[in-house]
Amino acid sequence: MKKYPISHYKKSGSSLFVNGGTLTVTDSECLVEYLNKEVVRFSLWDTVVTKASSELLYEGIRLTHDGQSIDLYFPKMGKTIRELREHFHMTD
């Protein structure tokens, strides 16, 4: 299990900006916790495309929720996980 420190959560519209708490990555899922409370849990497949992208979980990632699914935006790459999956030709 890998844990990535994040500094604070704040909501802005439908986006959750992750700046605090802990993002835990297991073999099957990711869990974001803040103040020991589960904030959001989602499939690892939707979150980490490659080892390279998993290493980019750092302050500034943005979690977005469209009502059905959650996506992560990586500022350094300027792409979301969905875009990365499309780039690597990965499908559901």
Task: Describe the function of each predicted region.
Residues 9, 33-35, 64:
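A generic structural motif
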Residues 2, 39-92:
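Acidic, Ser/Thr- and proline-rich intrinsically disordered linker/docking segments
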Residues 1-23, 83:
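Anionic N-terminal interaction surfaces
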Residues 14-58:
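Phosphoinositide-binding peripheral membrane targeting modules
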